[in-house]
Amino acid sequence: MSSMEMWMDAQRSCRMDQEHPVGPQVAPCSFPQNIKEESTYCLYEQPKCPKASTAEDLTYSRLTTTGLGSSTCTVTDGGGGGGGGSVPVPGYFRLSQTHAHSHKLYNTNGPQPNPSHSHFGLHPTAPARFHTPPTSTSTPATAQEGRNTEEPVSSGNADLQPHAAPGTEEARESSDAEVSSADETEEHDKERQAKSTKGDTKSENTANWLTAKSGRKKRCPYTKHQTLELEKEFLFNMYLTRERRLEISKSVHLTDRQVKIWFQNRRMKLKKMTRENRIRELTSNYGFS
């Protein structure tokens, strides 16, 4: 109920025209008197209305009447600032907007003569309308300030990037050089190891061929005594039976398989020699040489 008492209290109005007349008398306006006067601003914006700035309120009424003419009282829109006869004070911009909103709300069908203060109490949505315009006007200003601050920062970062780029490129080149040198050393080590392993394998192969360390047995030629005994048996009989082969293997200290293989090789050698001798005899008889 305290708010209603504040609305209904006629003694707390901010009108100072009757007590201290400073400017010329204001001509009647097309707007209702309670909206045109500064008392509306003080009623809705009581905490924001400066108590000691009565002279500024009077000068604002004088400027609006002298700047726009004494016959009519038109209201300029205070969104961007810099209009004719408007003062760059935030409270007055709100007042000009309240004039426009009140003109739309209360003068739709024509001017209403002298409504009482209780008429404002019937419309509780009016205070919200007075508080909404400042947010809309202040947000673009803050957005522009944020953009202005971001632009120097971005330009500074753009200036720092070219200076930082050479250092990063040098660091990358040095790291690449180190990596390449490490790769080269690893390749040389691998080549040396491969060469050493190749030499080792060659020596091992020769040693294996001589010592028969691999799965294959060492090539061991027959001794003179063994070859002599086998040659005697071959002259008597080119083909051996199983019993005779076992007897010869025991006498010569060889296995049955070794004796068998030796006789096979000896027969192939004899066949080759007889073929060569036959060809030689034929050529000598016909005199081709």
Curated annotation (Swiss-Prot):
GO CC annotations on file: nucleus
Cross-referenced SUPFAM superfamilies: Homeodomain-like
Mitochondrion in keyword set: no
A molecular function GO annotation: RNA polymerase II cis-regulatory region sequence-specific DNA binding
Main location: nucleus
Compositional bias annotation for Basic and acidic residues: 187-203
Compositional bias annotation for Low complexity: 132-143
DNA-binding region(s) from the entry: 215-274
Keyword Metal-binding set for record: no
UniProt KW keywords: Developmental protein, DNA-binding, Homeobox, Nucleus, Transcription, Transcription regulation
Subcellular location: Nucleus
Chain intervals with Polar residues compositional bias: 103-117
Disordered as annotated region, ranges: 103-218
Its job: Sequence-specific transcription factor which is part of a developmental regulatory system that provides cells with specific positional identities on the anterior-posterior axis.
Similarity field: Belongs to the Abd-B homeobox family.
Protein name as annotated: Homeobox protein Hox-A10
Species of provenance: Morone saxatilis
